[in-house]
């Protein structure tokens, strides 16, 4: 049985990053042409977190933009969307595949404003989340097969709904910033509903 060492795994990740522009340069727009890490600082930040044995580093604006937000290009309904984007953006937890993830087609400023919206229940019913006031397009990724990273396999589900997020205080910016994406809630079908101030769907009489 061949053992995959940390050194060989990192070399594999580097190779995949170099190959991606060649594989997708004719298929999609600019966001899908260049490797995810466009400068040395971004890549070094990824390597430190990847090799760390301690807790996950706190989120930053650039990290949220890099791992969660996407630009127009590859169709959001593509069945291979998550497999490609997870690998391209290096969305892993240490040496493991993440069990689920969300990609959102929106600007960072709009997502950050959501941190100041009213609290609503999260999908787990425990923590408090903030809900966007507008519908957001995105993709929900659900892990179906876990192997040695980066060869994680996902089902991709297109969604258009209200995004639920948790936020945290960022000392350097002196602002609340997005921390995790909890859910992308699709509005009820075949009803003319709207959100009240408490973030609850209401159907007019």
Swiss-Prot record:
Q: Which residues form a coiled coil?
A: none
Instruction: Give the SMART domains listed for this entry.
Output: RNAse_Pc
Cystine pairings recorded for this chain: 97-152, 115-167, 122-129
Q: Which InterPro entries match?
A: RNaseA (IPR001427), RNaseA-like_dom_sf (IPR036816), RNaseA_domain (IPR023412)
Chain positions carrying an annotated carbohydrate: 130, 142
The positions making up the signal sequence are 1-24
Which one of the record's GO molecular function terms can you name?
Answer: nucleic acid binding
- Cellular localization per UniProt: Secreted
Q: Belongs to which family?
A: Belongs to the pancreatic ribonuclease family.
User: Which PANTHER family is this protein grouped with?
Assistant: INACTIVE RIBONUCLEASE-LIKE PROTEIN 9, RIBONUCLEASE
Q: What functional role does this protein have?
A: Does not exhibit any ribonuclease activity.
- Protein name in UniProt: Inactive ribonuclease-like protein 9
- Gene name as annotated: RNASE9
